[in-house]
Amino acid sequence: MDADKIVFKVNNQVVSLKPEIIVDQYEYKYPAIKDLKKPCITLGKAPDLNKAYKSVLSGMSAAKLNPDDVCSYLAAAMQFFEGTCPEDWTSYGIVIARKGDKITPGSLVEIKRTDVEGNWALTGGMELTRDPTVPEHASLVGLLLSLYRLSKISGQNTGNYKTNIADRIEQIFETAPFVKIVEHHTLMTTHKMCANWSTIPNFRFLAGTYDMFFSRIEHLYSAIRVGTVVTAYEDCSGLVSFTGFIKQINLTAREAILYFFHKNFEEEIRRMFEPGQETAVPHSYFIHFRSLGLSGKSPYSSNAVGHVFNLIHFVGCYMGQVRSLNATVIAACAPHEMSVLGGYLGEEFFGKGTFERRFFRDEKELQEYEAAELTKTDVALADDGTVNSDDEDYFSGETRSPEAVYTRIMMNGGRLKRSHIRRYVSVSSNHQARPNSFAEFLNKTYSSDS
C-alpha cells in the first residue's frame, strides 16, 4: 500500500493516483555574498556635478525627472558625504573599511561607469547661474532619495498620510544644515510623476547604499536617512516581526520557538535561520540585501514565513497591538489554526510577568535575600510523595513552560476557550478594520461565537 495514493471509483473503474500539488512556487535566494566582491551596479559616464545639479533640480521643478540621470547624479554626489569609519567594518568576509578610514557611501559598493553621456536637459528652464553649494547638493540628494520612501507607501494607508510624510520631509530639507532649493509641495508633485521609482533597480541600490552609510557614520547630513530608512530590512517583515515578538514577550529566540506547536513552522524556522547569513550582525550587507540586489525573492518576507507571521500577529492582536490588528493576514498559511495557538500564547504572556528583586540597599541584604530564596527553592523541590510534581506543573496554571501550554491546548481539544474568543472579539470590534487585516479576520471568524 502506497501511503501517498488515494483509491476511488470512476464509472465502476478503480482509480489509484497520487494527488500532487505545488507546495512552494517560489525559489528563495539567500543574500550571502560568496565571491568576496562588493555589491555592484553600472551607470553612465560620471557627470560634471554642477551641470548635473542644475539639470536635476530643473527637472524636479518641472516634475520631469530622468531616472538614469538621477542615478548618475546620486552616485557622483556621494563624494560630498565623507565620514570617518568608527570601527573595522567587514561583512560576509569583505573588508568595507578599516577603523579611522575616510569613507563615503561609494566606499561600501562598486559603481562601474560606461562612456555613455547622460541627457542633462534643463527641463524646467535655467534658474541657477552660479555653482551650487554643498548644502544645496545635500538637499537635492535628500529630496531625490525621499522619492524612494514615498513610492513604498502603499495605497492601503488612509487619508493624507503620504502628503503629511512628504510635508515633513520637505521641512527637514528646508532647515539647516540643509537649505531650501524647491517650492514647498514640489516633492509630492514630483512623486506623482515617478510613483514607482522604488522598482528601479539602480535607484533602489543607491537608496540602500546611502542608508547603509548614514546608519553607521555620524555625519552632518545624516538626516538624509529620512528618505532611505525603508531600505533597511526591506521585504523582511517575517524576520522583523519575529524579532519584535521575542522582545515583546521577553524571551530569547530559542525559548520562543519552543512554543511553536505546529508542523508547518519547521520549514519556515529552517528558512529564517539558514546558516551563513548575517541576520544578527550589525551594519552587515544583510540589512540592505534587497536594495543592493543580493536576493530576488526574500526568504524572510511575510509570505516566505507566513505561519510564523500569522501566529505572531494573532498574539499581538490578543495583546491589543494596533500594528498587529492592521497587518495583513497571510490567508494561505492556516490562519484559523494560528489564531488558536495565538490565543493560548496571548493569554500566557498578556497581563502576567516574571518579577524578582534585583536591587538591594547593601551587600548584606543581597546575601540574606539569596539565602532565603535558596531555602524556598529547596522546600519546593522536596517532593512529599503525594503528587507527581511534573503533573502539578501542568495543572496549576502558574507555569508558562512550553509543556504546560501545550498540555492546556490538548486538554481543550485544540480549540479556543470562551475567554480567548471574548478577548479577540473585544480587541477587534473596537478597531476600524482594514480589508484582509487581522482585525477583520477575528471579527468575521469569532464575533458570532462570543
UniProtKB/Swiss-Prot annotation:
Main location class: virion
Modified residues (Phosphoserine): 389
Effect annotated for changing residue 389 to E: No effect on viral transcription and replication
Localization per record: Virion; Host cytoplasm
InterPro entries in alphabetical order: Rhabdo_ncapsid, Rhabdovirus_ncapsid_C, Rhabdovirus_ncapsid_N, Rhabdovirus_nucleoprotein-like
Outcome after substituting residue 389 to D: Decreases viral transcription and replication
Record PTM text: Phosphorylated by host CK2. Unphosphorylated protein N seems to have a better affinity for leader viral promoter encapsidation. Phosphorylation of protein N in ribonucleocapsid may stabilize the interaction with protein P, thereby playing an important role in viral transcription/replication.
Sample GO molecular function, one term: RNA binding
Record keywords, A-Z: Capsid protein, Helical capsid protein, Host cytoplasm, Phosphoprotein, Ribonucleoprotein, RNA-binding, Superantigen, Viral nucleoprotein, Virion
Pfam families xrefs: Rhabdo_ncap (PF00945)
Summary of subunit composition and partner proteins: Homomultimerizes to form the nucleocapsid. Binds to viral genomic RNA. In nucleocapsid, binds protein P and thereby positions the polymerase on the template. Protein P acts as a chaperone on free protein N to prevent it from aggregation before encapsidating genomic RNA.
Protein role: Encapsidates the genome in a ratio of one protein N per nine ribonucleotides, protecting it from nucleases. If expressed without protein P it binds non-specifically RNA and therefore can bind it's own mRNA. Interaction with protein P abolishes any non-specific RNA binding, and prevents phosphorylation. The soluble N-P complex encapsidates specifically the genomic RNA, with protein N protecting the genome like a pearl necklace. The encapsidated genomic RNA is termed the nucleocapsid (NC) and serves as template for viral transcription and replication.
The family this protein is said to belong to: Belongs to the lyssavirus nucleocapsid protein family.
Further details from the record: Displays a superantigen activity in human and mouse, activating mostly V-beta-8 subtypes of T-cell receptor.
Name assigned to this protein: Nucleoprotein
Source species: Rabies virus (strain SAD B19)
